[in-house]
Curated annotation (Swiss-Prot):
HAMAP family: SecA (MF_01382). Monomer and homodimer. Part of the essential Sec protein translocation apparatus which comprises SecA, SecYEG and auxiliary proteins SecDF-YajC and YidC. Keywords: ATP-binding, Cell inner membrane, Cell membrane, Cytoplasm, Membrane, Metal-binding, Nucleotide-binding, Protein transport, Translocase, Translocation, Transport, Zinc. Transmembrane segments: none annotated. Part of the Sec protein translocase complex. Interacts with the SecYEG preprotein conducting channel. Has a central role in coupling the hydrolysis of ATP to the transfer of proteins into and across the cell membrane, serving both as a receptor for the preprotein-SecB complex and as an ATP-driven molecular motor driving the stepwise translocation of polypeptide chains across the membrane. This is Protein translocase subunit SecA. Residues 862-873 have a biased composition (Acidic residues).
Length: 908
């Protein structure tokens, strides 16, 4: 009540922000005349003038009005496009590190040139982030003439480029690229072995186009670089044969047993074995030789089998072909639930992708091991300043504020919106709904209006396509299977009577122009004459006027999405730049959203109204129930994303520590002081194992210490003899004497090969050990994360336990790094400078090969790229052993009882 009164008196926060920026727009407009009067040389010289003023202490905010006026004038001269006042406001919103919500067709790409130009003046680099390589290249090529006219360089980073090309792109004033590529390059840079191999200059300022898609829809998508783990494809096949023998049960009433072997929860996308299911699965596994007689499925050694059963059940009962994935060229390709696009190279994790491959009876790719990872949430929070643009952000304003600290400002449209949004029509069954959609399409086509039909899955788009073919209606289908044709089909989707079926939301980033796109028609001609171009324009103008007179583009939604924002994106395709248009959603009680979240409430309403087959309900109560269901799903998804962030923040803190350590090592030519410090710590810790601090001589284990010193540091020290010969030796002096002996042994090796070679060797060993153990640590963190929910059964807070145990794992990793670095450098004898250079060359080659295969992962997944080659773990190191070579599967000579490859052989 009070807030609504206050809003009437003071205006909303959004209105106040727009009003404040309106004053700056006035100043920019006042400068327009004087800037327009400048000749070409004087206008171009402004960039250097601004840079000089920045160096003298002026701020970007002080330069903003003049810089925006210069960018606007350059746009007029180079591209024939003048920024509207609302576009100037959009530019200010972006410069201030906020999100600008701008409707479809309002010129977001042109708006970005204003803050990009201003912030590029600092020379620190500006990143413009898009959702795919096509848009990155298109936008860079489109805006490059404007930037280059003003003396700024433009680069593009896309997948498949070599390191040199990427370094050049990042060295540019402005760099365009995709969210995936920026994130992967960050990870690759933190796996490099020298500073010269790093591509990025840092994270200064980023403008994220389609910010809702990248920071919200893909927030649950980890970016992971991985290598292969052990092959278990045969096990997936065997388990896949057993799953059809299990009977699905319905969730029981409280206290009642499950009638079946397992239950499925579609909301959380999980499956759970019942008591009878556990017993039956154990019988099946034993019968097929996968479980020892009398063994329990829950024994620690068999948890992997339980994991395989769970993945197979999910593959069969929660993931459907042509909805969640398609099979293409003998591979399972994920379909993005938000856009309907395929995502080649991405794989579900935790064995799910392999289980689906087994289900589809195609080649099973190997599982993988994480080498480096982050999330989009944490990557984009690295930027000093982050901004974004989209047509639909206001519904997620709370999440942008909570997670990223970004405010959303809704920018007014340049022209008022004329689109009509009709109420939803709800039917009892899917068949009735689709028949109503077909009738609507037929009716609209007879009016010579274009129709865009949005579907939630490939399956639905193909079903609708088959119905339209039966009715003899010409149409285009745009889904994950035909995304190569995307831009062309969308460009012509505004022609009179054109019917286009698209999954959500194919063609995003390309406007549907009423009457079709005349520029696309011109582009199809090899060498068009002015007369041909004039004719194409005239024909287009006729079609354009015809469509506007008929009522503009009609958008039909065949299903409500879980997120209102995705529905608004579909609606936003119609009514661009003040054009007329209309939208309508058709629903049924059998739709996923209705069935899982809203069916009972709506069904009761429909029964109360006495609905008959073929009839539709159009009522505010129904719309409210649907909106409530969507809010419920949005809230659940927000909780999932927030929970992911809370868990990943733990790993993120550790990631920062490790990456800073790597950068410090790479930036330093001489790390001998660091080596000396950790050598002292490691020797002291080793001595303490056998001679506890403040203990008496009778408690000392001198033979064990002598053996350990030889094993760990390669020194044969007569400790017992020292003690016998010098009765004054006590715990502290003995510790110092041992350390000195280890140091002396190391110095002797250094004298043989030279200090510079040894310094280089120390760096390479430290980086190699750090990377190897960090990789193992990431795997351990994955395992910890997968099982941490079980702590809840012990009345413990899983998040707190995760933080505590993750810290312990990290502390253990740091201790192991120290120990292994010292052990390796003490056990080797470097021979030649040439061998050091060969080590560096091989390592870079292996890294380059690995980087080429880096892939993004899908939500609820960890990346699995079966072709990635695991980095060689020390096998190329140019050293000669001082001891006899031990087989990897033989017992370790240190006496630990472990296999050599799992103990001291880990780094050799």
């Amino acid at each position: 009540m009070f807030s609504s009164i206050a809003r009437k008196i003071f205006g909303s926060k959004n209105a106040r922000e727009i009003k404040r920026m309106g004053k700056v727009v006035k100043r920019i407009n006042e400068l327009e005349e004087s800037i327009s009067a400048l000749d070409e040389a004087a206008l171009k010289a402004k960039t250097q003038e601004f840079r000089s003023r920045l160096e003298k202490g002026e701020t970007l905010e002080q330069l903003l009005p003049e810089a925006f006026a210069v960018a606007r004038e350059a746009g007029k001269r180079v591209m024939g496009m003048r920024h509207f006042d609302v576009q100037l406001i959009g530019g200010m919103v972006l410069h201030e590190g906020k999100i600008a919500e701008m409707r479809t067709g309002e010129g977001k790409t042109l708006v970005a040139t204003l803050p990009v130009y201003l912030n590029a003046l600092s020379g620190k680099g500006v990143h413009v982030v898009t959702v795919n390589d096509y848009l990155a290249r298109r936008d860079a090529d489109w805006m490059r003439p404007l930037y280059e006219y003003l003396g700024l360089s433009v680069g593009v980073v896309v997948s498949g480029q070599d390191g040199e090309t990427k370094r050049a792109a990042y060295a540019s004033d402005i760099t365009y690229g995709t969210n995936n590529e920026f994130g992967f390059d960050y990870l690759r840079d933190n796996m490099a072995f020298s500073l010269t191999d790093k591509a990025q200059r840092g994270q200064h300022f980023a403008i994220v186009d389609e910010v809702d898609s990248i920071l919200i829809d893909e927030a649950r998508t980890p970016l992971i670089i991985s290598g292969p783990a052990e092959d278990s494809s045969e096990l997936y096949r065997k388990i896949n044969e057993l799953v059809p023998q299990l009977k699905k049960g319905e969730p029981p009433e409280e206290g009642q047993p499950v009638d079946g072997h397992f239950t499925v929860d579609e909301k959380s996308r999980s499956v759970e074995l019942s008591e009878s299911g556990h017993t039956y699965v154990e019988e099946l596994l034993t019968k097929n030789g996968l479980l020892e007689e009398g063994d329990s499925l829950y024994a620690a050694t068999n948890l992997g089998l339980l994991h395989h059963i769970s993945s197979a059940l999910r593959a069969h009962h929660l993931y459907s072909k042509d909805v969640d994935y398609i099979v293409q060229n003998g591979q399972v390709v994920i379909v993005d639930e938000h856009t309907g696009r395929t995502m080649p190279g991405r794989r579900w994790g935790e064995g799910l992708h392999q289980a689906i491959e087994a289900k589809e009876r195609i080649k099973i790719q190997a599982e993988s091991q994480t080498l480096a990872s982050t999330t989009f949430q944490n990557y984009f929070r690295l930027y000093e300043k982050l901004a974004g643009m989209t047509g639909t952000a206001d519904t997620e304003a709370f999440e942008f504020r909570q997670i990223y600290g970004l405010d959303v400002i809704v920018i007014p449209t340049n022209k008022p919106i004329k689109r009509i949004d009709y109420n939803d029509l709800v039917y009892l069954s899917v068949d009735e709904k689709f028949q109503a959609v077909i009738d609507d399409i037929k009716d609209t086509v007879t009016q010579n209006r274009p129709v865009l039909v949005g579907t939630a899955s490939i399956e639905a788009s193909e079903y609708l396509s088959a119905m339209l073919k039966k009715e003899g209606i010409a149409h285009n289908v745009l889904n994950a299977k035909q995304h190569e044709r995307e831009a062309h089909v969308i460009a012509q989707a505004g022609r009179p009577g054109a019917v286009t079926i698209a999954t959500n939301m194919a063609g995003r980033g390309t406007d549907i122009v009423l009457g079709g796109n005349w520029e696309a028609d011109v582009a199809e001609l090899e060498d068009p004459t002015p007369e041909q171009i004039a004719k194409i324009k005239a024909d287009w103008q006729k079609r354009h006027d015809q469509v506007i007179a008929a009522g503009g583009l009609h958008v039909v939604g065949s299903e409500r999405h879980e997120s209102r924002r995705i529905d608004n994106q579909l609606r936003g395709r119609s009514g661009r730049q003040g054009d007329p248009g209309s939208t309508r959603f058709y629903l049924s009680l059998e739709d996923n959203l209705m069935r899982i979240f809203a069916s009972d409430r709506v069904k009761n309403i429909m029964q109360a109204l006495g609905m008959q087959k073929g009839e539709a309900i159009e009522h505010r109560m129904v719309s409210n129930a649907i909106e409530k269901a969507q809010r419920k799903v949005e809230g659940r998804n927000f909780d999932i994303r927030k929970s992911l962030l809370e868990y990943d923040d733990v790993a993120n803190d550790q990631r920062h520590v490790v990456y800073e350590q790597r950068n410090e090592i790479m930036a330093t030519d001489d790390i001998s002081e660091m080596i000396d410090a950790i050598r002292g710590d490691v020797v002291s810790a080793t001595v303490s194992q056998f001679i506890p601090p403040q203990s008496i001589a009778e408690q000392w284990n001198v033979p064990g210490l002598e053996k350990q010193l030889e094993s760990d540091f390669g020194v044969d020290l007569p400790v017992q003899q020292w003690l016998d010969e010098d009765k004054r030796l006590h715990e502290e002096t003995l510790r110092e004497k041992i350390l000195q002996a280890v140091v002396d042994s190391y110095r002797e090796k250094e004298e043989v090969v030279g200090a510079s070679v040894m310094r280089n060797f120390e760096k390479q060993v430290f980086l190699q050990v750090l990377d190897t153990l960090w990789k193992e640590h990431l795997s351990n963190m994955d395992l910890l994360r997968m099982g941490i929910h079980l702590r809840g059964y012990a009345q413990k807070n899983p998040k707190q336990e995760y933080k505590r145990e993750a810290f312990e794992l990290f502390q253990n990793m740091l201790d192991t790094i120290k120990h292994d670095v010292v052990r390796v450098i003490c056990h080797v004898r470097v021979q030649k400078q040439e061998e050091m250079e060969e080590l560096e060359r091989r390592r870079r080659e292996a890294l380059a090969q690995q980087m080429q295969r880096a892939q993004a992962t899908h939500p609820e997944a960890t990346e699995e790229d079966s072709d990635a080659e695991e980095q060689a773990e020390g096998s190329d190191a140019p050293y000669v052993r001082d001891h006899k070579k031990v087989g990897r599967n033989e017992p370790c000579p240190c006496g630990s009882g472990k296999k050599y490859k799992q103990c001291h052989g880990r780094l050799e």
